[in-house]
Amino acid sequence: MKNFFFHAPHSALSAKKSIRKNTFPSGASFRAVKKALLLLLLFASSLFAQDTAGLSAPGRMRTADEGFASEEFRRGVQAYYRGAFNEAILQFERSLSYKSDDNLILDWLGKAYYRSGLEGEALASWKRAYENGYGGILMQNRIEVVSERRVTGDAYGKDARYTEAGSFPGMNGDVLVFSEPVSSLPLADGTLWVVAYGSNELLKINVNGTVVLRAEGPINGFDRPLDVIALQSGNMLVSESAGDRLSLLNPDGKFIKYIGSKGRGVGQCVGPQYLAEDENGNIYVTDYGNSRVDVFDKDGNALFYFGRAQNGFAGFQGPTGIAAVSGGIYVADNVTGGIYQFDTAGNFIRTLVREKTFRFPESMKAWNGFLVVCDSNKVISVDLETGATYESAKTGNAPSRLTSAVPDANGNVLVTDMKSNEVYVMTKMQELVGGLFVQIERVNADKFPLVVVELSVENRRRESVVGLGEENFYLTEGKRPVLQQKLIGAASNNKIEDITIIIDRSKESAAYGAQIESAVRSLSSAMKGEGTLRIVCAGAVPATEYKGSPRAAEKFGINVLKTPVSAEVPLDLALRLAANDLINAEAKRAVVFLSAGGVTQNAFKKYGLSELTAYFNNNAIAFSPVLLTQGAADPEIAYLEENTKGKSYYVFRQEGLAPVVDDLRNLPVGRYQLSYMSSLNTDMGRAFLPIEAETYLMNRSGRDESGYFAPLE
């Protein structure tokens, strides 16, 4: 409970002076003093009662209104933890009607509004409590973060400046951990593979810098490994610059086979450098010794090479970094200092970045419309459209040779420094200063004193923080450490996804019945019988038409739908209905919207776009439209897709829709479940028990405070 400091009223101070001057005051003076002190005590008790929701009244009997307020508050907390946020809002509003300025009720009312997607109302409630002196820095930070998130912006762009948040050094005291890190491959669970050129190995490292796995390649080991990429097949590919070959590994780093050999013919290479894979699964390798790019198919069969002089292009002199983006192949040359664009057949298209722009470009990765290039001690962002360059990070004046910069699952940029023998974790300055955004989302005390807590951990840009371990969390109850704290699980490790498919029943989309059937069947089959599939029809009155195993929908027919085609479709109600059923679903959950891309009149009459995106984001629900036509979707659908997790797909895209489910499964979800044994007195289940959670990661931390009720006895 927050302590309140106040000045005594002037009359009370005068009364105290009177007591000091007169040992035996007159009867009238004594009554005045007594009255003033009584008013003072009542004022103090009323101040302290503003954070109790009527659950307690220190030094006096509770009033009837306080009793009613506490009962409604209890029901509100229980509804909140059930995921019934609208019900929780009603209960907290009722509680507030009995205690109109209670800060604890205002805090929880704001939480319920926030989870319901009504962020404006949440902020108003929190600000009211904060202005009453409640919450301190913790409440102030929450208000700032939520306010900032309502202003959308690019997570990575030309103005993004990154600074070091921590590092993984190659030496731990006198112990060698790895030598000369040259590239890295971040994974969806927060871990990363690091290629160690000097120690000839591949290391898997968690977010705390602990090596959890080492891979040394085939029996005879790697021969100066230089780059690693993840293939669409799920396997990994490593280039061996001294071995003049590529090594194919399984996801656990086990060797499968070699690709390529030493030489100058097709399928051969001398000093292979960096790797890329295009949308068709073809593999591109910068062949430094042969001054060209070698191309293999997805099975490792040699196709061709390119890089010799052609119209408008003088030929490679020292090809290094390479990236495949939307049908274009981009190659950096460390002799000419430029970046060149080709098509997938090796035909020269243009010089994206003029020569002599870079001093010594190395690895090059695509990220959000930019190429991220390492050049000496700098990380440079290159606009894919214009070729304009922007400095995104710099290591300073110490000896440095940055060789790769790759975005990870937590919104950081992982930078390998071969010369200083470190892997830097770089983040935006405001993230480093602002810390982590931690929320206690659910507390289950049904088996008290065993308590299970569900937490979400995000950065200030609403990006999930994944890969945390038990050592990253510290739980307390009433500021005292809990007993037997354990990390039960992390959502990022969950391989099961619950999916709700919304079928647009507008007249426009109804003309694409065959496409809808194909999409539902493909998505259902891709779920492989795991998780729960729901089908919601967006008609004049949205309705859930199916809930159960995905297997039953693998032979879906459009004729089984009961919801009629409608000229007007309240899409907002369909989206809310779909999301409501996912609140208590698997930790990984998503809505897939099948539509021709248009919206009807009054599609967002009850709920606005910002409220819908907040509802999805604040409950970790991804949104992916599958368009039945090749045209662009209406701006409303595009807004929903751009401001939630997930992305848009075309129903008949070359890769099919099966990878959509994998894409959704691989989205980062920063939710964690911990347990502990409580030592608090429940007062027969009537006491509101406190719980505090702190999360630490490198130089950042975050905190949240909440509470719960044990079962009534």
Feature names for model-found ranges:
Residues 492-547, 553-595, 601, ...:
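Von Willebrand factor
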Residues 174-188, 219-232, 264-278, 311-326, ...:
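Beta-rich, blade/repeat-based domains predominating
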Residues 399-436:
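Blade-level signature of beta-propeller repeat domains, shared across WD40, Kelch, NHL, RCC1
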Residues 434-437, 443-500, 507-512:
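Acidic, polar low-complexity linker/tail segments
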Residues 431-434, 444-451, 642, 652-713:
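C-terminal "exit" segments of structured domains
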